[in-house]
């Protein structure tokens, strides 16, 4: 793709805007609570859009449209599973987690919450969960750096190493400086950009082909299987794709948004906004890939880019169908998707290192100012490690994203779900669930005889372990049960 001045200008303005937001947030960051959770001050709109944007990475504008373009509508099962999982997470977990974390020593991180909720004097829960976060999220961050590098490489013709730093630098800067507020405010802008791109692009593609009926006719003529929801899939394959939705209950970067809401009363409105945004974005991504089939079938001379790599479908359609200024805005949406996810993952890693390890074990009486600066240093450290991992694009980092999603979903998902819904759950139950969930994912990935996504058996076995170990051990203390009951009563409005 040739580099055009409008695209360069658009990208530069967008990146400058994100960094500016970071410096504005810097002025509002007074203590570590502000840096990690924004002082629990997020309203409904910011909570909803930042949760959505931090969830949907470059996969939304590249991976999903590419899969639909290559294989047809059957690849949309994963979008259905994610939508169901996200709604259940908002409905069951979001409000309860917001209240429970405040009642349990104003917990700022998931390991912090687990330690307080289950009265873990040994700090085993805090250490194990912090280590799980660091391992999986460093891999996750590396995948985001690779995706950003690929965008700069293909859009501006940069060599990979230069693109690596260009794609990561702005995200690191505004996360480093502004912390959670910067990440959440930029997520809101980025979510708006993403939904604009994903609604506008498929409409223009359909118009370019000649309308909806003509588009469907061309797709059907190429292969009627493109419209078959079960093309090449059996029951296990469908369940595996739907199973992605289970991952939501255990994703620390999404759960952090719930914890940061200004009140659990904001969650209901945030859920409606967030789910509307998500459905429109996923629907738009599916439509880009689906109707892209019709466009390139009618214009085979323009299909060289997508023939080489189906994941370029959105990039190619933006470049071909829009003037360079609008194309620059649309392509900035891919960068927005990458940056929004990478920034919150960097922050969650930083909080695990600072709150759960540095303050928890090394400097219990550290000042707020010290913790903020240690948090910033940790953002930089994790970012540099992620860039080092991403330096060799052949190391298949992107292929590990589904592994990390399953790892978090199985290790943390059942612990969070039972932890906010069942007062009888104990520390041993939480430990057993976390270990069994993580080990099941690892072993199933290596030795699973059934081609079932490892998050499903991981989630099931972890849930069984939680119930068995909680019921066979000593019940939680009266104080712990009282705190849980008080939080639940507040959530229910009693």
Model-derived regions: residue spans:
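Membrane-embedded helix-loop-helix hairpins and adjacent transmembrane boundary segments
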Residues: 1-494
């Amino acid at each position: 793709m040739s580099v055009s001045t409008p695209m360069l200008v658009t990208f530069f303005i967008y990146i400058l805007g994100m960094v500016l937001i970071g410096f504005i947030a810097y002025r509002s960051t007074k203590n570590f609570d502000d840096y990690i959770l924004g002082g629990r001050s997020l309203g409904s709109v910011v909570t909803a859009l930042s949760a959505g944007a931090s969830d949907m990475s470059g996969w939304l504008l590249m991976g999903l449209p590419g899969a639909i373009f290559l294989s047809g509508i059957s690849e949309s099962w994963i979008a259905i599973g994610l939508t169901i999982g996200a709604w259940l997470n908002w409905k069951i977990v979001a409000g309860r987690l917001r209240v429970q974390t405040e009642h349990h020593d104003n917990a700022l991180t998931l390991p912090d919450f687990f330690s307080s909720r289950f009265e873990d004097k040994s700090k085993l829960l805090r250490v194990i969960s912090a280590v799980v976060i660091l391992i999986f999220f460093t891999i996750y961050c590396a995948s985001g750096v690779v995706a950003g590098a690929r965008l700069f490489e293909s859009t501006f013709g940069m060599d990979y190493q230069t693109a690596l730093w260009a794609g990561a630098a702005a995200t690191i800067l505004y996360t480093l400086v502004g912390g959670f507020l910067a990440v959440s405010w930029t997520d809101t802008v980025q979510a708006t950009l993403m939904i604009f791109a994903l609604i506008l692009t498929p409409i223009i593609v359909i118009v370019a082909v000649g309308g909806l009926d003509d588009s469907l006719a061309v797709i059907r003529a190429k292969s009627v299987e493109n419209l078959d929801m079960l093309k090449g899939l059996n029951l296990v394959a469908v369940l595996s794709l739907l199973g992605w939705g289970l991952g939501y209950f255990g994703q620390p970067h999404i759960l952090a948004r719930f914890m940061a809401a200004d009140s659990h009363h904001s969650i209901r409105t945030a859920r409606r906004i967030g789910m509307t945004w998500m459905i429109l974005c996923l629907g738009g991504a599916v439509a880009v890939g689906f109707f892209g089939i019709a466009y390139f079938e009618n214009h085979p001379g323009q299909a060289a880019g997508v023939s080489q790599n189906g994941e370029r479908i959105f990039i190619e359609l933006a470049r071909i169908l829009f003037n360079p200024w609008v194309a620059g805005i649309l392509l900035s949406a891919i960068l927005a998707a990458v940056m929004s996810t990478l920034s919150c993952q960097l922050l969650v890693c930083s909080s695990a290192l600072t709150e759960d390890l540095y303050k928890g074990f090394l400097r219990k009486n550290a000042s707020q100012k010290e913790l903020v600066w240690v948090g910033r240093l940790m953002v930089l450290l994790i970012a540099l490690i992620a860039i080092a991992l991403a330096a060799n694009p052949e190391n298949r980092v992107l292929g590990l994203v589904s592994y990390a999603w399953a790892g978090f979903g199985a290790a943390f998902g059942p612990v969070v779900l039972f932890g906010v819904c069942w007062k009888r759950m104990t520390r041993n139950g939480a430990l057993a669930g976390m270990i069994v969930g993580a080990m099941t994912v690892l072993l199933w990935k290596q030795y699973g005889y059934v081609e079932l996504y490892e998050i499903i058996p991981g989630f099931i076995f972890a849930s069984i372990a939680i119930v068995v170990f909680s019921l066979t051990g000593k019940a939680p203390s009266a104080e712990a049960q009282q705190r849980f009951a008080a939080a639940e009563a507040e959530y229910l409005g009693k």
